Amino acid sequence: MSFRNFKMVDYVVFGRGAFNQLDEILAPRRKADAPMIFLVDHFFEGKPLVNRIPLRGKDKIIFADVTYEPKTTQVDALANELKESFGTVSGIIGIGGGSTMDLAKAVSLMMNNPGSSADYQGWDLVKFPGVYKAGIPTLSGTGAEVSRTTVLTGPTRKLGMNSDFTPFDQIVLDPELTKDAPVNQRFYTGMDCYIHCIESLEGTYLNEFSKSYGEKALELCQKVFVTKNHWDDESDDQLM
């Protein structure tokens, strides 16, 4: 039997207020005057969170419309715009929900891979690592911040760019960022996590390593959705 040697996120910081460390986290990843590009969920336009983003030099904030799942055309347009404006960038930082996470991962990959993102929809088709990328989720439960795929709607199909180059280099998990999320959105993405737990415990390809994650995640989901009759800060911590 052959076992898969799978890629995971390189660095993780977790805790309330962790977002405040973003500047020091990004500092060693900056390359000369090449900017950091912050892809931010359009929900946050005009909101206080934007003023906390640690901009330096040519850094740029781009508000991404993620009403619908990212499209390959959207990814290609953003990557081409950045190449034309800056040549290259120090990194792509995604701030938002699952669709924003996927968009940031895809744009990072397309900064260093030729053609269209549609060419890489599938399994292990990406040839080169992308530029540095960090994910900062503002919703819990999608799992997009830790997955090896980025789900895109292409010209002919909806499919992920699945590769070992896809996972983020860094994620910042700050439960405080989920506090102002709409209640229904919190519930939907939380149940997404709950269903992932069931899949990870009842699926076809199981092992004790993966089951240990599924069991603990299910326990935390049950604390949030079953044993409590109200939502509090601890719920945000547990779900993230």
Located regions from the model:
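Glycine/serine-rich anion-binding loops at beta->alpha junctions
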Residues: 88-105, 138-144
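Predominant activation on well-ordered alpha-helical scaffold segments within soluble catalytic domains
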Residues: 23, 76-79, 105-108, 191-199, ...
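DPxDG-like acidic metal-binding loop motif
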Residues: 102-114
